[in-house]
């Protein structure tokens, strides 16, 4: 009986000691009002060295970048650059972001550019970055080949047969270029996208015998015939 009583008292005593130690550890190791301070002070900051744009496959893309110590935040813009001379903002331009990621809407067959600039921190006397980090991003299928301006398209594919591929192939015509096609182009069982430039369509002139043949699907985009 006494042994059981002693063991129970001992157990309660140990539990109390552990609880006190845990509480003390929490109060010493954490202060909910404390703030973390960077060691980077009185510095000219640089923009992030690594910017990643990831397609979420749901009509959006996430822009991520590495932390720049001593920063007071980041200035982020995302542009449609189908026409590089007339960048179109997607979402808020020069958005202030207190973090390392942001999400934007995206569309098919579009070229984009993400810009991330580090902002200064007055408390640490750190100066903002002079230039933004830039990252190109596209929702275009990767180009398999680009057909030179002035080429007969049928002759091009005779000289450059389609590779064996289980994935869709994409062939580009040069923006504003002119082309001819005077014979049959047979893509067989390969899925192909045949495209020009969204802003400055190339033009293809068909001869009497010209036609495309496919049994796997052909997408023709941004080309005038």
Give residue ranges: language-model regions.
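Bacterial N-terminal signal peptides that target proteins for export
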Residues: 2-14
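Acidic Gly/Asp/Thr-rich repetitive segments characteristic of extracellular carbohydrate-active
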Residues: 139-180
């Amino acid at each position: 009986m006494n042994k059981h009583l002693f063991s129970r008292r001992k157990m309660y005593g140990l539990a109390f000691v552990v609880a006190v130690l845990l509480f003390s550890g929490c109060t010493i190791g954490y202060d909910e009002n404390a703030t973390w301070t960077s060691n980077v002070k009185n510095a000219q900051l640089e923009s992030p060295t690594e910017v990643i744009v990831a397609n979420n496959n749901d009509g959006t893309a996430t822009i991520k970048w590495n932390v720049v110590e001593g920063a007071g935040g980041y200035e982020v813009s995302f542009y449609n650059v189908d026409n590089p001379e007339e960048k179109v903002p997607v979402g808020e331009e020069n958005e202030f972001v207190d973090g390392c990621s942001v999400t934007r809407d995206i569309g098919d067959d579009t070229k984009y550019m993400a810009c991330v600039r580090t902002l200064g921190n007055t408390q640490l006397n750190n100066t903002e970055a002079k230039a933004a980090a830039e990252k190109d991003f596209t929702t275009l299928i990767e180009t398999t080949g680009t057909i030179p301006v002035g080429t007969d398209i049928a002759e091009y594919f005779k000289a450059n047969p389609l590779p064996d591929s289980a994935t869709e192939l994409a062939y580009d015509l040069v923006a504003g270029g002119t082309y001819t096609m005077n014979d049959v182009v047979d893509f067989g069982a390969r899925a192909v996208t045949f495209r020009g430039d969204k802003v400055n369509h190339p033009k293809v002139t068909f001869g009497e015998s010209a036609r495309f043949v496919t049994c796997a699907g052909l997408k023709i985009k941004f080309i005038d015939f």
